[in-house]
């Protein structure tokens, strides 16, 4: 064995070990265990379901898994439904960072405090409008007699109470408008800013152009995404950092497309629309093979369109309650129910249909 063959063999072994290590890390998560089990690069993974069935919520957790796994993996997100929330992704990553670093208590910073105070002020305003405020109702009419020209503010005891209520209202308003980010929230924002690129295409042609076919193409898409995500990139004329695309340091972890069937009825009226979807599938599969990353799409309409030439591995998402949703493999008829909490994602395997075990094995 000469030196060139020896180096090639070492490189091949290191790639196999890194691939096994990556697969081991991926399979530690219950959601990725269902999605990525048995799939290879170049396979299009599609999560189907009705509106508000938890499809986008799944993508939030898949993106958080990549961001937590390594600081060298990038996430490309294409949201053609325009409802992708950066704040929601930051909140999920914020909670995952807290649980991964061994913090037992829930962090009460930022939007958690803001939402809590806003709900308190909203309840107080509603009670005041309905006349059910405890402070007002506690003052009985029999205790004091008011003349026609007097008001409650003219009495010393009621004046002190009114001033106290005013101070409390000012405190609630200041607390609801003030944001106190913690270190976990800042880390989540920093990770999303450095490792995520989010695009909101307005036309189907923009969706096709958002799928990279080379490293140079990925650099162009990443720069366009940063222009859409940050106004400072345009206003302050800050230079784009191309060092993150160094092949030796970073790699594309996954491509997430929210809304595969958004432009279906727009394309349905055009000639050759089936070929357009076939070209989109080819671009997605090519990107998966080129960058060695999974491609996950959401879809709510194309599951019954058998005439479309889209070959993919299908899953069904169904929301059962506010804190859990159901993910089913459409081929094996087996599913898992995921419970979302502050500690992360918990799962409970169960049958997806009332078939017997023998019938399930035949499938």
From Swiss-Prot:
GO terms for biological process: double-strand break repair via homologous recombination; mitotic recombination; reciprocal meiotic recombination; recombinational repair. Required for normal levels of meiotic recombination. Acts in the recombinational pathway of double-strand break (DSB) repair together with rhp51, rhp55 and rad22. Required for the full extent of DNA recombination and cell survival under condition of a replication fork collapse. SUPFAM superfamilies: P-loop containing nucleoside triphosphate hydrolases. It comes from the Eukaryota. Gene3D superfamilies: P-loop containing nucleotide triphosphate hydrolases. It comes from Schizosaccharomyces pombe (strain 972 / ATCC 24843) (Fission yeast). This is DNA repair protein rlp1. Interacts with rdl1 and sws1. Belongs to the RecA family. RAD51 subfamily. The keyword Aminoacyl-tRNA synthetase does not apply. One of its GO terms (molecular function) is ATP hydrolysis activity. The gene is rlp1. Keywords: Cytoplasm, DNA damage, DNA recombination, DNA repair, Meiosis, Nucleus. GO terms for cellular component: cytosol; nucleus. It is found in: Cytoplasm; Nucleus.
